[in-house]
């Protein structure tokens, strides 16, 4: 018998190597995903803060609330961070809730 193919031992070794690679890779992907969502939220807050400033410049320094920014098209309605946190505007400052 001179059949070519993988033995059971060879298949087990391959499965072990793949499992180890997955154990190393998955936690890193999760960690980077959380970091990306946090930075995305920070960027969105900065954008909303810039829109608050633009509104104030257009309206003689009046501090807007969220409804005013949404109704005049400065920001989209129901704007949320990538991680699901809502954007809150208080005293002219944007922050994640």
UniProtKB/Swiss-Prot annotation:
Keywords: Cell membrane, Competence, Disulfide bond, Membrane, Methylation, Transmembrane, Transmembrane helix, Transport. The chain crosses the membrane at residues 6-26. The keyword RNA-binding does not apply. Required for transformation and DNA binding. Disulfide bonds join 41-81. Homodimer. NCBIfam families: IV_pilin_GFxxxE, pilin_ComGC. It is found in: Cell membrane; Cell surface. Residues 1-5 form a propeptide. The modification N-methylphenylalanine is found at residue 6. The keyword Plastid does not apply. Belongs to the ComGC family. One of its GO terms (biological process) is establishment of competence for transformation. Its main location: membrane. PROSITE patterns: PROKAR_NTER_METHYL. It comes from the Bacteria. This is ComG operon protein 3 homolog. Pfam families: N_methyl. It is a single-pass membrane protein. GO terms for cellular component: cell surface; plasma membrane; type II protein secretion system complex. It comes from Bacillus licheniformis (strain ATCC 14580 / DSM 13 / JCM 2505 / CCUG 7422 / NBRC 12200 / NCIMB 9375 / NCTC 10341 / NRRL NRS-1264 / Gibson 46).
């Amino acid at each position: 018998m001179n059949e070519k193919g993988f033995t059971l031992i060879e298949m087990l070794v391959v499965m072990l190597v793949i499992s180890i690679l997955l154990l190393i890779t998955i936690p890193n992907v999760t960690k980077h995903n959380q970091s990306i969502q946090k930075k995305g939220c920070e960027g969105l807050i900065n954008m909303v803060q810039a829109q608050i400033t633009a509104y104030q410049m257009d309206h003689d320094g009046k501090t807007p609330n969220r409804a005013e920014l949404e109704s005049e098209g400065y920001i989209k309605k129901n704007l949320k961070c990538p991680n699901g946190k809502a954007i809150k505007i208080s005293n002219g400052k944007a922050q994640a809730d």
